[in-house]
Amino acid sequence: MRSVWKTLRAIKNGLKEGYRWFLQTFVLRLFVRPDVAVSCAFSAARPSSSEKVVATAMRCAASTYLPSPEGLIANYLLGMDLLGRHGTDSLEWKVYPERAIITPDSAKIPRSTKNYIKRNEFEIVWSRDFEGVLEGCQRQKWSWITPPLMEIYKELFKMGVARSLEAYQEGRLVGGHLGFTVGHTFAGMSSFHAVDRAGTVLWGTLTRKVMDGEIGMVDCGEQKPHFARYGAYVVPREEFVQRVVQGVIRSK
């Protein structure tokens, strides 16, 4: 193991500054298979563009990490999401060319949402009933959360990685955001609500946590008008990966 880290350190020192984020991904976070990190790093050591770095990394990761809790996080650090195909048990890695993110300098809460929050209709807590939120999201029409993926998220929750922001009304779970935390980033993967305004209050609360510094960045996935209301803006995949990795480094 010591020789692996020594090799990685030597490779890192030989790369241009602009590509160091790539190795930081593997050196600091791909804790499952450090030997794979070495082979991926060597194959991308002389890229003609940063886009080739990402492409090479994705080929290495996609061919190495089978669908698993560890593989989900490892590939997420390369801008890849693990999704299920509705109505089947199959899983696939999905790559988006752009990601919508909410950051402290962009976060905003619409006035109507602030008014809903002030009514105190809902109790908002983290991860009181994670499986309840997981099941609520899975019941949504055309949900990509297949049974095998549910098991992976349950394992991520046991590992302390997956979490859910939940809304309760009179003690009953009425809404939730499902996701996981990587460094300073909260990856919002799915959500549901069973009563009016629960989803709105959850979004307002999540955005407030970004504004207050509890969360460094929210990954919204693909941009939607609803996300933009809370300050979400689009960045290229490469910039998104850089931001996630930098958040991991700062969290250490």
What would you call each of these model-derived segments?
Residues M1-K252:
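N-acyltransferase acceptor-side catalytic subdomain
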